[in-house]
């Protein structure tokens, strides 16, 4: 089972991703976060197979959150999400 933490500051987007993945047998969104601070708090309490992380969120950006995740949980799998049409954030996120 792939257990996902979905992190995005738009509740409608989180709901859409949840709905999209609901038909997948081996995938579950088990937690949500509206900002980077909530992501870090969630990681302090449990582990996840995968984090879907928005690049631009309030509270702490996805890029800042990614740096923190890499420092404290270096083996954590993360997929960065962006609505930006440019790929300017790709090298930073890597």
What residues fall within each predicted segment?
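Alpha4 helix (beta4-alpha4-beta5 surface) of REC/receiver domains from two-component response regulators
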Residues: 64, 85-94
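Short amphipathic alpha-helix used as the core "switch/output" element in two-component signaling
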Residues: 41-42, 63-75
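Short hydrophobic/Thr-rich beta-strand motif most characteristic of the beta2 strand and flanking loop
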Residues: 26-34, 42
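The feature encodes the CheY-like receiver
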Residues: 13, 58, 82, 86
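Conserved hydrophobic packing residues within short motifs/helices of P-loop NTPase cores
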Residues: 5, 30, 79-81
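Conserved acidic segment of CheY-like receiver
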Residues: 1-13, 17-21, 51
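Acidic catalytic/metal-coordinating carboxylates
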Residues: 35-38, 59-64
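Active-site beta3 strand of CheY-like receiver
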Residues: 46-52
